[in-house]
């Protein structure tokens, strides 16, 4: 079990308050007119405890009246002595603690010149002290002689934090650089948690500080009192760039465990970072590893109610698949823990997942064959009913029977996470059946009337048959075929060290994602210039197959138009047919009575052609205006989110700032406030990092993906539009860049 952590350093919280001024109230003499008296001050009683004192720096001090300055110095001395006494520690530093507090406050503020000046003040004030010729004074003088710039910047407060700890806490890069140049100890561990400056850099989720510290000699292998190394800290804060860098520098994520045997997957699952957990599993971290309580990452995802984490863990197959039957030391499975926490959404998901896994005995090929047959029957059965059953009975039968059959099949045989061949088989079989009707019934009668549309029908039919099948096999533009994991890591390190835009990584493919690319969980790959996943071909549409996709769409439209022409010629060849212009209803009833199959397929084809034609035009527009379908969807979601409240009401989103003693500037909260309890009875880790909250679970999150570590947070969706001609040229002749370009050169301006 992960123990409950104690509240963090009070000093780090208290430094955020404004200075307090203590003054003597005006005295009024009895039986005399009230007169305004000047402010008079008197010191607090020597035995009185100072509840709080804001540390004031020299630059702030000079703005105060002289009498305030004198009183503050007295209070600061008392405050420092009071802190030492309360801590119970033996203070042995050569510099008085009141000066240490001021020095660390200046480091927080990041004023390098003031920091330098105060170091000189410390040196001079300690050199000017006259000591007695006794043993104590001689020892003090020896300590004072050892005061150097390096020793001063490594002075610690009573929590063991140095100037560089606080400079990193405030993300002051100039101050951090100055302290490193002056010889700051980068491996010093504070007293409360054993955190090094590198640990705080990972906690603050800033890879630039991690790079700066490690390149200057910080030890990446040091662990704190709970066994967390830098990688485990960065993982809890969803800081993928720091994690990648530390792994490249030699930290093995498979071997990283804290003293409670929690792996990186345990912690990321507990915090709700689904993509980060996926990333570690892809790197080889065992998702079924058990901690000291016997719990896996799956247990913790169910305990905390993170549905995204639970569904992610359930999506792995093969050697990385999770064992849902593992029981913890209390004999409980993850499902039982979810029940005890009343996470009903997760319970429903796991019930559905269990049923899906048992479907067709787990045979996915049989699953696809079943839905392929269902697709063919979806075309044939309604047509047969309308042809051979009176309309008055056929239409109600189709409406009622179709409704119940659809819902039955969807509830019992449909798996949303899998590709499904129902829609592709409907489209392909309908064209195939109509073409057979054309060859057997229509063509022999109308070929001599007008040969041109018949030639078009045959050409477009075979074009559609061949390239439709090819589309289901065609590579949409898999990025991993063009760039390796090793090259991705090299490019990442170069970008991080040079200060360029850091490329995003796919947590599944483990490669850098170029701009406008996306990972598709159904197709299991990252694709360049991702447009959308098409359920009619069970394949993603990307830069490599979009042109072919558009031609297949237009071939279908042309096929339907040509088919309608020859079908109309076929109807007119019947000498018994009524004249259409005289009675549309009578003509329709005549053709429905005598040629029901052909008429129904013609109506179906026209309806499909209208929809597919609209899709084809929209695909052309994505090229002309250089905005993919996925980007259009994201733009709509962004617009919808801006139309909402724009703030949280506390239920769905976690707070983005910390409250009380658990936060302060450090943003590192220890204790049960973010969990539902602590101790063995609660079932929670009892440890959270409150500065940057975990992502909202799927039950409460918005549609827009909020995981900034793995997804672009794009707001300008027109940035790629450079004119129609340039857009077409880019699509046709400059498509290779979509496999490699990770920096968005259009982010700031349109070219």
UniProtKB/Swiss-Prot annotation:
GO terms, molecular function: protein-cysteine S-palmitoyltransferase activity
Transmembrane segments: 385-405, 421-440, 446-469, 548-568, 597-617
Keyword annotations from UniProtKB, A to Z: Acyltransferase, ANK repeat, Glycoprotein, Lipoprotein, Membrane, Palmitate, Repeat, Transferase, Transmembrane, Transmembrane helix
Pfam families: Ank, Ank_2, DHHC
Segments of skewed composition (Gly residues): 660-683
EC assignment: 2.3.1.225
Record: active site: 534
InterPro entries (UniProt xref): Ankyrin_rpt, Ankyrin_rpt-contain_sf, Palmitoyltrfase_DHHC
Phylogenetic placement of the source organism: Eukaryota, Amoebozoa, Evosea, Eumycetozoa, Dictyostelia
GO cellular component, one term: membrane
Compartments reported by the entry: Membrane
Enzyme class: transferase
Chain intervals for the UniProt region annotation (Disordered): 1-40, 641-711
Residues spanning the signal sequence: none
Glycan attachment points: 161, 626, 656
Protein name, per record: Putative ZDHHC-type palmitoyltransferase 5
